[in-house]
Amino acid sequence: MKGRLLDAVPLSSLTGVGAAQSNKLAKINLHTVQDLLLHLPLRYEDRTHLYPIGELLPGVYATVEGEVLNCNISFGGRRMMTCQISDGSGILTMRFFNFNAAMKNSLATGRRVLAYGEAKRGKYGAEMIHPEYRVQGDLSTPELQETLTPVYPTTEGVKQATLRKLTDQALDLLDTCAIEELLPPELSQGMMTLPEALRTLHRPPPTLQLSDLETGQHPAQRRLILEELLAHNLSMLALRAGAQRFHAQPLSANDALKNKLLAALPFKPTGAQARVVAEIERDMALDAPMMRLVQGDVGSGKTLVAAIAALRAIAHGKQVALMAPTELLAEQHANNFRNWFAPLGIEVGWLAGKQKGKARLAQQEAIASGQVQMIVGTHAIFQEQVQFNGLALVIIDEQHRFGVHQRLALWEKGQQQGFHPHQLIMTATPIPRTLAMTAYADLDTSVIDELPPGRTPVTTVAIPDTRRNDIIDRVRHACMTEGRQAYWVCTLIEESELLEAQAAEATWEELKLALPELNVGLVHGRMKPAEKQAVMASFKQGELHLLVATTVIEVGVDVPNASLMIIENPERLGLAQLHQLRGRVGRGAVASHCVLLYKTPLSKTAQIRLQVLRDSNDGFVIAQKDLEIRGPGELLGTRQTGNAEFKVADLLRDQAMIPEVQRLARHIHERYPQQAKALIERWMPETERYSNA
């Protein structure tokens, strides 16, 4: 038996990890040596052989070696250092925008340099921007890497080189310490051991096929993917078992309020809406808490379904809480529910972070006394000081913004007198069946697969940025001649609200100049909620012709007169998000258009993506296509499933394993409860506390 277990060895025991470094590593959930070993590379770089400079092709990542010919600093539009090296077959220009005197001195003429980076075609031949480089000693042969070089997910202040050095130490510890094998012997037979798999994935030998690693097919990956998917499924089984131990208030049929609401509507619910309502009502009549996910495409009428579910609870004298991810969306829900419920004598309350002082206190008192039966708001409705009076149903809108942990915390909060509230979760992001089986294995699923009559399909076109002026003319025509309104959406690669806001402000200034006859508004994530609400209100009332926005308008904004949307750089967004954005138009009876204003050249994947949007308005078709065309390295993150990203598994790539994993998870859950618990702790520690609830 080896020494102590690596899940008990803190990272601070490694050389080079002091208090400051520990805090940085904690930001990416790295606390123990086991955590570090399970923090696997995103991709690999092959630095094991040299490329002749003369044979470099644009877009190829390569290691080159050459002699420094010159190194100069220029002070044009931007301070820059350029260094040229030659290996006899050609000359490479290395460009640096961030540099210091020590770097300049190290690149003295005549020195030999080993450089790695992406080759580009420059003005004077091959170029690399900010390559990694090392000045060679007097060795006649360059010091190349012996294994493929891992590239890890990281955080600010933690360099790749640091993670590689720490991982080297962690791999050495595998010789003296143990990492526990948790798979039952009948499952792990014929598979790589955990230490073998970890060594292979952190330091793959150059003989290993990169294509196997990129597609997730290597036996070392399969070993860990199986374990992670099992842990995920076991956590869902534990959550489900936990939920079934609880009791909810059974809410039997009591349809007087529902019938009044339906009689007052100017339309009849679709067959799909009626079917989903029946599924929800069946759940709510039981004494176990309902945990149901309702998927409906953009505009399929999920809100009406939620309203009917709410009336079932209110008819029994109980309260209902609806939580939305943004104040904008919450306010819109509050308005919809007031319009429907006020004629029925039901009071709708509204709670958001921006409410202060007396108004907030008055609202809290009205909730605590039971005067308000329907409460709508953001996550502010589940803060400590909000006391409910018989909360029987919780509705969460836009599940992929909340995630499993918030869903469960909210459920705990709603517990009163031994009863847990029923839970209804609504998402407009259609989830293909395989993903729903895994990501929402703790929920029952309903699908509203029919759009209400009278919706006009949106015509989508893709146009290059070179025709920007034509599109600006089209906006002018739509707003001035046709009396319509339009959205202009700015997107960014970086998940940075600041940069996104700056991009939107620059576009807003440009469009105000180009369209002086239009009232142009601006909304982005860094504005105060009240400012955002004011802009959206004036757009909804028709005071603004054109709204420049970031992707904050992705969910729930309803302006029927808006019939034109321009999305800049659509190639930067996933299909599901583009489909969500497009759903903001086509809400009235007028023909609506969405223009995908892309920058050339487009990658092959981006071309296919944009084509899918042009061909289809069906969110389920689009979600299925998304599965088929996403590259192997694209992980499914919080945006699309409500779950934290997987470390090794990829629900899209590994979907064929899921039915078998579910069978094995049930086997482990029943036969090996201790291993099941340990697997959840290893891969999904946050879920553990809920499964023990």
Where are these regions (language model features)?
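N-terminal pre-Walker A segment at the start of P-loop NTPase domains
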Residues: F267-V277
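C-terminal accessory region of SF2 helicases/translocases
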Residues: P601-A693
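Long, highly charged, low-complexity intrinsically disordered interaction regions
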Residues: M1-L14, N23-A26, H232, G242
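Structural detector for short beta-strands of small beta-barrel domains
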Residues: P58-R79, G117
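Inter-lobe coupling/hinge segments of SF2-like helicase ATPases
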Residues: R275-A278, P289-Q611, H667, R671-Q675, ...
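Short boundary/loop segments of OB/S1/cold-shock single-stranded nucleic-acid-binding domains
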Residues: L42-A62
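Upstream accessory/linker segments immediately N-terminal to the RecA-like ATPase cores of bacterial MutS
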Residues: S74-A264, T638, R671
